């Protein structure tokens, strides 16, 4: 995590890096090559989670958590096959139902999301241009889809912190009208959130929605 970094600098970095990495993203986002994002522990990260033990012990414990979340077991290949099959069952169910609207609701969240015609739910594994299956995100628990750009209405409250450009955004609330964020607040990192939302007009809209289980190897770590 970066400390005391001007949110304007973070926003500018994200914008410039997006332009500089455009060709690379063209390959990965269209699956012209197989790729994966993985988590690698650092000493600072480990001590942030486990401040009361030595740096080495903290690193070891963080590696253990990452291995658990990433299903690095005695037979990780089989574990990932079973996990991908389980996620695919969920996406097959949703794709067969073709729900027109989703409703997210909690004590604060009250959000209605319209789904576009012909929408397709996806999950953990993908296939490259040669038809070879791979997992771009490890670990992953989500099934996800594209919402209707102008069909998101209501209030959305975060349940976990968001780390953006090394800065933490916590306890934030977004209000949507006709797909667009029209108001927002955050108890921590509100200025960073502002720059994220105001990157351009497109960043005022949701590009993806996801469903994740309440209990999972990631969630159960409670870190």
Predicted regions, residues:
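Long, well-ordered mid-to-C-terminal structural blocks that present hydrophobic/aromatic surfaces
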Residues: 145-195
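Short, glycine-/Ser/Thr-/acidic-enriched flexible segments
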Residues: 1, 42, 109, 118-120, ...
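Dual-mode signal for accessory low-complexity, basic/Gly-rich regions
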Residues: 183-223
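Active-site bordering "gate/hinge" segments
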Residues: 1-153
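A short secondary-structure junction signal
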Residues: 3-5, 46-51, 124-126, 167-170, ...
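Short solvent-exposed loop/turn micro-motifs enriched in small/polar/acidic residues
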Residues: 95-97, 165-167, 202
């Amino acid at each position: 995590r970066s400390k005391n970094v001007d949110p304007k600098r973070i926003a500018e970095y994200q914008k410039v890096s997006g332009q500089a990495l455009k060709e690379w993203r063209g390959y990965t986002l269209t699956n012209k090559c197989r790729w994966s994002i993985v988590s690698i522990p650092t000493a600072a990260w480990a001590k942030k989670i486990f401040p009361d033990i030595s740096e080495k012990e903290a690193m070891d414990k963080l590696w253990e958590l990452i291995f658990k979340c990433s299903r690095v077991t005695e037979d990780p290949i089989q574990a990932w096959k079973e996990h991908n099959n389980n996620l695919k069952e969920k996406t097959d169910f949703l794709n067969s139902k073709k729900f027109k609207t989703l409703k997210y609701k909690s004590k604060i969240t009250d959000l209605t999301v319209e789904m576009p015609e012909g929408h397709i739910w996806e999950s953990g594994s993908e296939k490259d241009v040669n038809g070879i299956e791979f997992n771009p995100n490890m670990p992953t628990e989500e099934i996800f889809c594209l919402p209707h750009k102008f069909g998101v209405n209501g209030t959305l409250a975060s349940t976990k912190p968001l780390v953006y450009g090394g800065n933490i955004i916590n306890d934030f609330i977004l209000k949507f009208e006709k797909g667009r964020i029209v108001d927002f607040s955050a108890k921590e990192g509100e200025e960073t959130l502002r720059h994220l939302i105001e990157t351009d007009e497109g960043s005022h809209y949701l590009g993806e929605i996801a469903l994740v289980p309440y209990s999972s190897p990631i969630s159960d770590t409670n870190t």
